[in-house]
């Protein structure tokens, strides 16, 4: 019995690193002064991707929950969390993101320009985070959280509200806009 438990424990230690990993991407992320570092953690078992952008006060963290089709971005300078539906036409699948991250490792911007997604942030705070699933609820719990709706592509140039932009690995640019971006 002890030998069986030892073998199972050893297999668990050897198999666990295969389920989730982190890739660090250094370079210009397009935010503020162009310095910083992004890291992407992909967990295929839980169907989530976690993107961390470390850039001082303009740092942010984004969680893409492929299981529930919601994404959340925590803006540290705004001390808030913004939740939105994932646009599966613009946001890569978990498998494609995995491939893109591996291809971008150690490289700077290049290739096609990033896809643009623009969101209008509703200024009303979210009361029940559980509607977005346990992963996003856990990330946004305890901080003001707002819901954002995607602004259709043709209307983007006409939208003149203040925006906070998050560039993700030179493949996707997400802008969160509203009437008072300073508050969220």
Swiss-Prot record:
One of its GO terms (cellular component) is Golgi apparatus. Residues 54-148 form the BRICHOS domain. Gene3D superfamilies: 3.30.390.150. Residues 1-20 form the signal peptide. Expressed in the stomach. Highly expressed specifically in surface cells of the antrum mucosa from where it is secreted. One of its GO terms (molecular function) is growth factor activity. Its main location: secreted. The keyword Membrane does not apply. GO terms for biological process: positive regulation of cell division; positive regulation of cell population proliferation. InterPro entries: BRICHOS_dom, Gastrokine. It is found in: Secreted; Cytoplasmic granule; Golgi apparatus. The keyword Aminoacyl-tRNA synthetase does not apply. Keywords: Disulfide bond, Golgi apparatus, Mitogen, Secreted, Signal. PROSITE patterns: BRICHOS. Disulfide bonds join 81-140. SMART domains: BRICHOS (SM01039). Belongs to the gastrokine family. Has mitogenic activity and may be involved in maintaining the integrity of the gastric mucosal epithelium. PANTHER family: GASTROKINE 1. This is Gastrokine-1. It comes from Mus musculus. The gene is Gkn1.
């Amino acid at each position: 019995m002890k030998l069986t438990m030892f073998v199972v424990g050893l297999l668990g230690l050897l198999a666990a690193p295969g389920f989730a990993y982190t890739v660090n991407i250094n370079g210009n992320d397009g935010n503020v002064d162009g310095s910083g570092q992004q890291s992407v953690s992909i967990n295929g078992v839980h169907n989530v991707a976690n993107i961390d952008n470390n850039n001082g006060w303009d740092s942010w963290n984004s969680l893409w929950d492929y299981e529930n089709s919601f994404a959340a971005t925590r803006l540290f300078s705004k001390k808030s969390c913004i939740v939105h539906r994932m646009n599966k036409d613009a946001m890569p699948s978990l498998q494609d993101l995995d491939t893109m991250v591996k291809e971008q490792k150690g490289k700077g911007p290049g290739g096609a320009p990033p896809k643009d997604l623009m969101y209008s942030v509703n200024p009303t705070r979210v009361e029940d985070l559980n509607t977005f699933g346990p992963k996003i609820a856990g990330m946004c719990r305890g901080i003001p959280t707002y819901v954002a709706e995607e602004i259709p592509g043709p209307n983007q140039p006409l939208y003149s509200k203040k925006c906070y932009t998050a560039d993700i690995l030179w493949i996707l640019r997400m802008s969160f806009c509203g009437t008072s971006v300073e508050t969220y």
